[in-house]
Structures are given as C-alpha cells and as structure tokens.
Amino acid sequence: MRAIFRATKRMPPGQRKTAAIVVIGDEILKGTTRDTNSHFLCKRLHKLGVNIKKIAVVGDEISEISREVQSASSAYDYVITSGGVGPTHDDKTYLGLAHAFTDQLHFSDEIRQAVNRFLPTYIDKKKSEGVEEGIEEVVRVVTEKLCTIPKMSQLLWGTQKVDGRVSTFPVVRVANVVALPGVPKFCERAFDELQDQLFPVEERQSMFFDTIYTDLDEFDFSRRLADVAARFEEQNVQIGSYPELKNKFFKTKLTIETESSESMEAVRIALKELLVGHIVYYDSHAWTDTVAKWRAFKKRELVEAKNVDFVRKLEEAEKIVEDIVERYPLDQIALSFNGGKDCTVLLHLLRLKVDEKYGASKAIQGFHIMVEDQFPEATQFIIDAAQFYNIQVLEFPGPLKIGLAGLKKQRPSIIPVLMGSRATDPNGKYMKTPVEWTDSDWPKVLRVCPILNWTYSDVWHMLRGLCVPYCKLYDQGYTSLGGRDNTVKHPALRIVASDGKEHYLPAYKLHNDAEERSNRSNL
C-alpha cells in the first residue's frame, strides 16, 4: 500500500512550477530497454522545487508524440521529453514536436557545425574497422537526420560542469518543451549542463523536505496520520506514507514537503509526537561520517531516551578502543571478525576511532578464525562488511589458539587484538578486565574486549540504533552463530500462524538475554 496525505487543496498559481515528462520509444513499451531517465528527471526536478504532475510513455509514432506533447504543453509549465532524438529512422521526436505545434521542419546550420566537429573521428573509426564503401552516404543521412528540426526551435547550449565551457552539442527546445536524448548518459549530462539555464536559482520555489522512518506498519497509524494532515490543510503541506517490506530497520517511510521552514518544523513535531517510541533514525550508510553520527546517537540516547546507563557503556567501550588506537600504530592492531553481532559492534567502534584520528581512507587490519561448516551467509557478510568498513581480513584455521598463532606468524608486529567477547560468553567469563594479556601458553597478544560488560540487549540496541549492517541470519531466528552443524534457529523466536505455517522473529526480539546461546549445541 502507498498513501499520500495531501494537506493542501490547490497550490496558488505562480508559486510552484509544474512539469510533465514524456518518455519516447517503442523499446520502452516492449520492455527491451529499462527507462531510467524519468526516475533521474523526477529526482532532479523535485530537488529544484518543480512539481512533477505526470509521466507518460509513448511509442515511436508521430501522432502519439504530437498528441501527448500538445496536451502536456498546454497543461504544465515545463515538458521534458527523453528519447527519439538521433540519426535513425525511428527517431521521430522532432517530427512529433513540429506536428504538435503546427510547425515546419528546417535544416539547422548551427547543429551541422556541431555535427561536423564529430565527423572526422567517426570517419577515422570506420576506416580503421575496414569500412570505407558507402561511408559518405551514411554521413549525409546522419547529418540530415540530426539537423532537421522544427523551424520555431530554440537551440540550448549548456555549460559543462568540468571546465565551465559551452556544451559540445545543443538541445532542442520548442515553446516549453525540451527534447533530451534517450541514452541515459547523454540525457543526464544534457540536463546537468542546462539545469541553471532552464531553472535559474532566483526563480526556483523554495521547498523544504524531510523524511521520518518508523518501525510501525502504516496501518497502525494511518487514521491518526490523516488527522495530522488535516491540521495542516491550509499550509500547502504534503505527507507521503510508503511501506517498506524488506528493510530490517524500518517498516514505513514518511516524507514531508512544504514551502516554509515554520510549517516544516510544526509538521515534524506533530509526526514525532504521533510516532513517539517508534521513530527510527535510519541510515543506509552507517559506516560513513561515523564520528558525527556517533555523537548524535549518544545525544539521542541521553536526551530523548534518558538511557544514562547505556550511554555510560558506550563511552567506556569507546574509551578503550580510543586508548588502543592512540597507543599503537594501526599495523600493530588487529580485529577478530567472524561476522557475528558482537564483533560487528567492535568493527564499528574501531572504524569510528580510526576515522577520528586518521580519516576514513585508512584501512583496518582484521582476521577471521574459520569454523567447520560455516554458514555461507556469514561468509558473505564478512566480505560485504570488509568492503563497507575498509577492513582487510585474513583467514586462519581454528580454534582460536591456533588461529592466533597463525596471525602472529604472518603478522608478528600485531600486539592488541580487539575481540567482541562479553562476560556471558563461554570464554569471556575468564577475563577479569576488558584489557588483558593472553596466558603464557598462548600466542602473546593483548586481548582487548571493549564490550566485555555489555548485555545481549545492549549489543542489539547499538547495532539497530545506528543502523549498523549485520549478518542477515540474525533476522531469520538465529541469536548466536556457530557452524551449520551445531546452530539452529532459536525456539523462543518461533511463531506459528493460524494456518499452521511457522516463521521466526529476528534475534533482537529475544526477551531473555540468558537464552542467547541456547540455539547452539556445543556451548
């Protein structure tokens, strides 16, 4: 379901410009080519404050192009077409424009000059391919096709973004209709080069946009949302509600559009009151700009949630990692990373402190102790996380003692090893403090366990509060990960529907922290 709650009767004329997009091409209608141009244009026009009222797709028929363009041109301020501009027989946009405006076609010498600049390169390319016969005729036909445009056309020369020079090829405009190429690369480039000419900064309508995410289904609050929209009926506010079925962090996205900062703030407050306790500060790239996001997260937990004890744990763990990063060079620090939830917390903390001191481009050193019959999903997550977080992960056979020996042999300079061990872990219970040297009969490393005193709930609160990506097995009912031979979905998360079908709740829904590892047979 998709819902839009319009808190506006009709925009007063002359305030916000309107536009229609006409996509032209049989290949779009046949499904042989995917249209990405309308999506690109909608995003760009929307950011410019233009109200997109319509998207139409028509085939390569002159009458269809003419009819759609004529209708849109009289109804909206701007019409942007894409496709049907080129040298072949089925490129009929210019013919359709001439028909729509009862105009004649003529040959443009200005376009011919632009075409002539490309011809030597084209001819040389064909000759290098051994094609010489008939090339002059091809050039003649191509030139005639590209240069034949409606007589009333205006040629728009854009500004190249790289060097500020005039664009190399013009775009045809007839009345309020702008004809862009259909090839996405050229369509996007042409729009970029013409944006400020078509939509001067001083003429743009100021618009304010915001997005709020919630872990509620939209059915849970749709009636109350309609009431909020009604309260702002006279303030030109538009609230959109969009369900998301596959996102692990939120279920519904709300968008707000308005013309004033005052009404935006009022709507934002109203929606946050409506969704209190269920707002998600969604972040699709949690591994970027980590320092600022970390500060904002702690502030929310302290000010909004009054979660003093949790913030204290965050800061204690942060301080431990910070001390290690300050004390040791990065080539002496390694992170034990097996794709589990605890070491994922550590990965984010280490990335945060490395970003703070060295910058995001600095790589992190890590290693993975392999387990027998490892879940392929865990392996894939390690690969993905390594790419996101810029961590170089070595693999060593297990168990841990043998793996550490392999690490020290390959990287003898390693001293501190960050681990996601907690006091409730089978091995974590032997640690008295978060930072300890290994026993004398082990490879000598400094074991650093910043979240030693965290609970299962603490781990999930941080991961989900910052939208840190984690292994998808945790959303399938697994609460602790080992190998496939000794790990099952947690029985406490099993749900049986009325039709007898079963499914499992995600791991963060487990209420009893003490049962975290009861889905593992070897612990």
UniProtKB/Swiss-Prot annotation:
InterPro entries: FAD_synth_MoaB/Mog-bd, FLAD1_M, MoaB/Mog-like_dom_sf, MoaB/Mog_dom, PAPS_reduct_dom, Rossmann-like_a/b/a_fold. Its cofactor is Mg(2+). Transmembrane segments: none annotated. Residues 20-111 are annotated as: Molybdenum cofactor biosynthesis protein-like. Residues 332-489 are annotated as: FAD synthase. In the N-terminal section; belongs to the MoaB/Mog family. The molybdenum cofactor biosynthesis protein-like region may not be functional. This is Probable FAD synthase. The gene is flad-1.
